[in-house]
UniProtKB/Swiss-Prot annotation:
GO terms for molecular function: metal ion binding; rRNA binding; structural constituent of ribosome. Belongs to the bacterial ribosomal protein bL31 family. Type A subfamily. GO terms for cellular component: ribonucleoprotein complex; ribosome. Binds 1 zinc ion per subunit. Pfam families: Ribosomal_L31. The gene is rpmE. It comes from Desulfitobacterium hafniense (strain Y51). Zn(2+) binds at C16, C18, C36, C39. This is Large ribosomal subunit protein bL31. HAMAP family: Ribosomal_bL31_1 (MF_00501). Its cofactor is Zn(2+). Part of the 50S ribosomal subunit.
């Protein structure tokens, strides 16, 4: 196998907007998510409206559209 072809795998945290922090390993430093297993309707049994419009607005803002 060739050396130095794989990205560095290190300890990182996944942070949800609900406040849940999940330690894990990844090639990325910090990962931020909008929905995790603590607040996802499938796991909680409580349905809630997911703001899809906010995602579109963030995309447009990010790419200057």
């Amino acid at each position: 196998m060739k050396e130095k072809t794989h990205p560095k795998y290190e300890q990182t945290t996944i942070t949800c907007v609900c406040g849940e922090v999940i330690p894990t390993g990844s090639t990325k430093k910090d990962i931020k998510v909008e929905i995790c297993s603590k607040c996802h309707p499938f796991y909680t049994g409580v349905q809630r409206f997911v703001d899809a419009g906010g995602r579109v607005d963030r995309f447009k803002k990010k790419y200057g559209m």
